[in-house]
Curated annotation (Swiss-Prot):
This is Large ribosomal subunit protein uL16. PROSITE patterns: RIBOSOMAL_L16_1, RIBOSOMAL_L16_2. One of its GO terms (molecular function) is rRNA binding. InterPro entries: Ribosomal_uL16, Ribosomal_uL16_bact-type, Ribosomal_uL16_CS, Ribosomal_uL16_dom, Ribosomal_uL16_sf. Part of the 50S ribosomal subunit. The keyword DNA-binding does not apply. Binds 23S rRNA and is also seen to make contacts with the A and possibly P site tRNAs. Belongs to the universal ribosomal protein uL16 family. The lineage of its organism: Bacteria, Pseudomonadati, Pseudomonadota, Alphaproteobacteria, Caulobacterales. It comes from Caulobacter vibrioides (strain NA1000 / CB15N) (Caulobacter crescentus). The gene is rplP. GO terms for cellular component: cytosolic large ribosomal subunit. Transmembrane segments: none annotated. The keyword tRNA-binding applies. GO terms for biological process: translation.
Amino acid sequence: MLSPKKTKFRKQFKGRIHGTSKGGTLLNFGSYGLKAVEPERITARQIEAARRAITRQMKRQGRVWIRIFPDVPVTGKPAEVRMGKGKGAVDYWAARVAPGRIMFEIDGVPDDIAREALRLGAAKLPIRTRVVTRIDAGVAQEA
């Protein structure tokens, strides 16, 4: 599962996801991509589940690029522990995803397989998504 090797601080504030994605909104590697439509934190487990679903549908042909990385530590306190006594330990890592962000890109498979693979990958994610395709160089179009 994805997680940072080293961070400046062990714990972070929760934060909010405001507005649309500032970068990562165009296809850079593949011919098809999965674009976020709403803001959400995506956990490392969800990213891995989506990657596996996409790879399985593609029957290990072509190539998959993961364009998001879980760099936000999410903490939690154990069950039946009273409030206070500091912030809990890091439970898992998440990626903040804003609307418009390309999360996955794929290439090297036929159109119908690519769309089905991304649809199955999107089912593993907690947000609404849209499949985008490369019409001309560097431009993501709604599919």
